[in-house]
């Protein structure tokens, strides 16, 4: 009986120690990846990664316009040419010339050594 109890206790300790190692993450590569769009059309792209990367970049950028309550992709935009390495990516582009009257947001694909993540900016009225 003591042997079975000791074995059960050891198994419980093992399960607890394995569970403590698990880290819940929404994304396995990016700590954060954000796009901020200002009322002047300036778009700031920021990303950080959990581990050091050889290449962090933006691969695609799209402009969305809200029409009758629905976001519609209206065109692709020039992507930032900046490529970083390490843990941090920061780039700024101005897309004001692509926006008329209405509410707009930007979608971009962040890429870190082949791992991709889509993100959307905040919506801004022009």
Where are these regions (language model features)?
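Short beta-strand elements
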Residues: 114-126
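Sec-dependent signal peptide cleavage junction
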Residues: 15-31
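Solvent-exposed serine/threonine-rich low-complexity stretches and specific carbohydrate-binding patches
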Residues: 60-61, 70-86
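Positively charged n-region of N-terminal signal peptides that target proteins for export
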Residues: 1-4, 8
């Amino acid at each position: 009986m003591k042997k079975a109890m000791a074995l059960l206790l050891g198994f419980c300790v093992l399960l607890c120690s394995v569970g403590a190692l698990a880290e819940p993450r929404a994304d396995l590569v990016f700590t954060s990846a954000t796009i901020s769009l200002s009322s002047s059309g300036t778009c700031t792209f920021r990303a950080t990664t959990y581990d050091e990367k050889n290449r962090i970049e933006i691969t695609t950028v799209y402009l969305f316009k809200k029409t009758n309550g629905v976001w519609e992709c209206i065109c692709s935009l020039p992507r930032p040419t900046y490529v970083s390495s390490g843990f941090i990516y920061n780039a700024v582009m101005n897309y004001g010339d692509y926006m008329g009257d209405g509410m707009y947001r930007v979608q971009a694909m962040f890429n870190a050594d082949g791992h991709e993540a889509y993100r959307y900016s905040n919506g801004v009225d022009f």
